[in-house]
């Protein structure tokens, strides 16, 4: 099997996101690379499902909270930008301040 560099990068994101998802499910707080991979993979899948850029920008802010990540991680991730493949082409999805405090 031959994968292009872009396909290799996407595969690496999916593997890292899977690890992050399993850790999150076990109650282990995510570090910086895990949090970015988790958010990125969800955005990529949403794009493949046909969701809109605007919808994914909002969705990206609901995936993780301060309780899901290690101390200091939210301050390190001010934005996540994902070049995602939509049914009508490739578009850039920017999620600003993706990790937010849980609402009461």
UniProtKB/Swiss-Prot annotation:
GO molecular function, one term: urease activity
Main location: cytoplasm
Pathway note: Nitrogen metabolism; urea degradation; CO(2) and NH(3) from urea (urease route): step 1/1
Catalytic activities: urea + 2 H2O + H(+) = hydrogencarbonate + 2 NH4(+)
Superkingdom, taxonomy of origin: Bacteria
UniProt-listed GO biological process terms: urea catabolic process
Entry keywords, A to Z: Cytoplasm, Hydrolase
EC number: 3.5.1.5
SUPFAM superfamilies tied to this protein: Urease, gamma-subunit
An example Gene Ontology CC term for this record: cytoplasm
Subcellular location: Cytoplasm
Assembly and interaction partners: Heterotrimer of UreA (gamma), UreB (beta) and UreC (alpha) subunits. Three heterotrimers associate to form the active enzyme.
Sequence similarity: Belongs to the urease gamma subunit family.
The protein's name in its UniProt record: Urease subunit gamma
Native source organism of the sequence: Actinomyces naeslundii
Organismal lineage: Bacteria, Bacillati, Actinomycetota, Actinomycetes, Actinomycetales
Gene (UniProt): ureA
């Amino acid at each position: 099997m031959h994968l292009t560099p872009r396909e290799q990068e996407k595969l690496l994101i999916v593997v890292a996101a899977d690890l992050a998802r399993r850790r999150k499910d076990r109650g282990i707080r995510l570090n910086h690379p895990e949090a970015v991979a988790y958010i990125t993979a969800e955005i990529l899948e949403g794009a493949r499902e046909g969701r809109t850029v605007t919808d994914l920008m909002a969705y990206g802010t609901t995936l993780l909270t301060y309780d899901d990540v290690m101390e200091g991680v939210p301050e390190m991730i001010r934005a996540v930008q994902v070049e995602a493949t939509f049914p009508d082409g490739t578009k850039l999805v920017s999620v600003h301040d993706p990790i937010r405090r849980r609402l009461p």
